[in-house]
Amino acid sequence: MEKRRVVVKVGSSTITHESGLLNLKKLDELARVLSDLDNAGHEVLLVSSGAIAAGCGKMGLEQKPKELDEKQAMAAIGQCELMYIYDKMFSQYSRKVAQLLITKRDLDDEQLRSNALNTLQVLLKYKTIPIINENDSVAIDEIVYGDNDTLSAITARLIRADLLVLLSDIDGLYDADPSKCPH
């Protein structure tokens, strides 16, 4: 079997309960499957949403905040929780993970994009599974307009992935938010 470079994107609703708390069973299953891919000789990168949802869950908030600064604070709290759990889950399968937080500016600027690519390549060389997320605690445009589907596609192109897998609870592919544009 030939070695492939695979980018897997997981959405917030896929890895959290409705309460916003992280779904440990699903996170463990994700870590196991991605570790199996890694064991088979593939290079695996994970683009993970969930920081804001995890922050809200950890803080006991019943609803996601509407104000940007509160979303950013929940992202900061949740990102720590998310990476702690990912590190714990992947270590059960003898895998090392690394965090890479990216903003739109990092991808728009040629030098910053090159630095991100170099970091990803070195992490893969060291047999580490990079976990990528938008840096929602400092981002402005992304937290309002962006999503990790776009980030995963850009990452897949940047790293020259052979395959991009989007794990979501949305049925199908859309060119706009299906909750806002139902057609």
Locate each region found by the language model.
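Nucleotide/pyrophosphate-binding catalytic subdomain
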Residues: 1-183
